[in-house]
From Swiss-Prot:
It comes from Vibrio parahaemolyticus serotype O3:K6 (strain RIMD 2210633). NCBIfam families: Phrelay_LuxU_Vib (NF041948). The gene is luxU. Residues 17-112 form the HPt domain. Keywords: Phosphoprotein, Two-component regulatory system. GO terms for biological process: phosphorelay signal transduction system. This is Phosphorelay protein LuxU. The keyword Ion transport does not apply.
Length: 112
């Protein structure tokens, strides 16, 4: 699974106009920064609730921006959350932090 799907990014550019992509991408990058900061600072049940929240939101935003690997992880965590399989001791928080950092860094490299 790729971190960035160039074809989806190109499709987004056609749909919304190439001038709008950098603006929306900046917003998406800002959201990822917020997610990383909050996941890093929260603890226990608050951290788990926040992971559920952002995983649900990331299913669509990551898909829209071609962040395939992040989208796949978000869908997996959201599914676990809905079935009650997500637990505080699980590895999902660290996996999400790693994937958010990888995705953010890949987009920043791509835009330079």
């Amino acid at each position: 699974m790729t971190i960035l799907n160039q074809q989806k990014i190109d499709e987004l550019s056609i749909e919304i106009g190439s001038d709008n992509v950098p603006v929306l991408l900046d917003i998406f990058l800002g959201e990822m920064d917020t997610y990383i900061d909050n996941l890093s600072q929260l603890e226990g049940s608050e951290r788990l609730m926040y992971l559920k929240e952002i995983s649900h939101a990331l299913k669509s935003s990551a898909a829209s921006f071609g962040a395939d690997s992040l989208c796949e992880l978000a869908m997996s965590i959201d599914k676990k959350a809905k079935s009650g399989e997500l637990v505080e001791q699980g590895s999902e928080v660290n996996t999400m932090l790693d994937r958010l950092n990888e995705t953010r860094d890949a987009y920043r490299s791509w835009t330079q």
